[in-house]
UniProtKB/Swiss-Prot annotation:
CC annotations in GO: chromosome; cytoplasm; extracellular exosome; nucleus
Upper classification of the organism: Eukaryota, Metazoa, Chordata, Craniata, Vertebrata
Entry-annotated residues carrying Phosphoserine: 12, 24, 27, 44, 47, 322
Tissue: Widely expressed.
Compositionally biased tracts (Basic and acidic residues): 17-34
Coiled coil ranges: none
Predominant location category: nucleus
The protein, known as: Protein phosphatase 1 regulatory subunit 7
Amino acid sequence: MAAERGAGQQQSQEMMEVDRRVESEESGDEEGKKHSSGIVADLSEQSLKDGEERGEEDPEEEHELPVDMETINLDRDAEDVDLNHYRIGKIEGFEVLKKVKTLCLRQNLIKCIENLEELQSLRELDLYDNQIKKIENLEALTELEILDISFNLLRNIEGVDKLTRLKKLFLVNNKISKIENLSNLHQLQMLELGSNRIRAIENIDTLTNLESLFLGKNKITKLQNLDALTNLTVLSMQSNRLTKIEGLQNLVNLRELYLSHNGIEVIEGLENNNKLTMLDIASNRIKKIENISHLTELQEFWMNDNLLESWSDLDELKGARSLETVYLERNPLQKDPQYRRKVMLALPSVRQIDATFVRF
């Protein structure tokens, strides 16, 4: 399973890779808990609590004393075990959980993944917000479908090659610099790598079942190596170092594209993405709405914080009969005293302009 756009889309965006986290659910919002679909976020998102890069150690956590595991009573017959924020410092004593399918250990003091080999029925493992530096000792968990090790201290993607049934992988807000060691995850549908240190999109050619890819808040300079991901419906690349929209020609099923907070100057390269319902190009350097008249299924268009000056550019959106939400604030044309009225006249289907609903 697993980003806010209220007054100001920036807030929304950060929720997405996360919100998307919602979709991805898992990406942001405190990240909420991913397991949804939507709205990754940064979400996402989600809203992602996609936030600051975390230091090697949190001084407060270092002084927090781990709980004595003998004081925790585990139900041997439980299928869902939630030990969120229990101050667990070491994974031990869980071998009695022969029937467990979901194990939540988020927000604890765990430094090492260990002693889980007996939990062979496990489908979901949540280690979000701990102090883990390495992905290891998961080889026996061959039934695992969801793995979340977001908000830890990981530097490498490793130790997941035997998890061939994995469908959702969340590694948000770590210190990962390279996408690697994922080639065996043929069933993966959602991959969340927001808020890391990744510089290139690479080594994902075999992930042909991937539906959602979240790479917001990294250091990526080019959209590339996406040709094999023909099932992708959500792509989030917010807050990177992109200057050009390219490499999307094979993503014919793409429905949501998030490219805000980059250095893009021209809307282009979307000729084959006819199914887009959401296009986020906010906070770039774009002067003109162009090359999107064929996107007739658009429902949301976010282009606030750019350099748009001409009202005639809105004609590019007239073919999108289902367009309901547009964000155009903090563009030069917003200075027009008749700004909202002109948007409504140009795009009569719109029900929300920026953060405000249209009143009739």
